[in-house]
């Protein structure tokens, strides 16, 4: 991919996901500061950093896109995996100290499951600005965190696409009340919990819109 084409080639899902995670991280940063639990939160997970990375969430996602060559679907699947991980670890809140590591690890996991061709962990470690040892450790911790539940049904994919589309609406016209949660369905593994209208035809339409 040529450098001059990167800005136009970045899929919409990257900007939408970065906006969603930015709001969630800022809200949790404020909550942690108000509760004065910074030191306690740092010990919750291996994903927790000691300092906030200088690069923004949006810049970090664009860097991943630029160098990892992920398909747009990977970012939706990474979002699903991240939600599954957080459901199983309710004590962990996405904030500015852990969101970058969570992102690079969830995208790495999604790429390996979704795309036919992907770079190895050493490459992703360089893209993410961490060591190979840390990348390997985070990947294993993440996989155990989601109980190796990597399968994503069409209904679940469509449901999370719908959430990202809602975020796109938020960007265009912010609602009076901020969207409070990162995830959408009570259980994305339960097809009965996802509406039939979000089946394969809608999935194809949503995937096209997010890739534009």
Swiss-Prot record:
Cysteines paired by S-S bonds: none
Pfam assignment, any one: Cyclin
Record's keyword annotation contains Cell cycle: yes
Keyword terms of this UniProt record: Cell cycle, Cell division, Cyclin
Gene3D superfamilies the record matches: Cyclin-like
GO BP annotations, alphabetical order: cell division
Listed GO MF terms: protein kinase binding
Family: Belongs to the cyclin family. Cyclin U/P subfamily.
Name of the protein in its database record: Cyclin-P4-1
């Amino acid at each position: 991919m040529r450098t001059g084409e990167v800005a136009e080639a970045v899929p919409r899902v990257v900007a939408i996901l970065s906006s969603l995670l930015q709001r969630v991280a800022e809200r949790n940063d404020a909550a942690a500061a108000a509760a004065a639990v910074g030191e306690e939160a740092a010990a919750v997970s291996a994903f927790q950093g000691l300092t906030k990375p200088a690069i923004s969430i949006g810049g970090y996602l664009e860097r991943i896109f630029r160098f990892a060559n992920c398909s747009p679907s990977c970012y939706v699947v990474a979002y699903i995996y991240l939600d599954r991980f957080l459901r199983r670890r309710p004590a962990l809140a996405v904030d500015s100290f852990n969101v970058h590591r969570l992102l690079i690890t969830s995208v790495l996991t999604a790429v390996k499951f979704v795309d036919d061709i992907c770079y190895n962990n050493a490459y992703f470690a360089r893209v993410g600005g961490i060591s190979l040892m840390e990348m390997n450790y985070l990947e294993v911790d993440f996989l155990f965190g989601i109980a190796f539940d990597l399968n994503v049904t069409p209904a679940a994919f469509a449901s999370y696409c719908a959430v990202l589309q809602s975020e796109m609406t938020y960007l265009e016209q912010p609602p009076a009340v901020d969207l409070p949660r990162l995830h959408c369905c009570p259980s994305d593994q339960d097809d009965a919990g996802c509406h039939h209208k979000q089946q394969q035809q809608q999935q194809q339409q949503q995937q096209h819109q997010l890739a534009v």
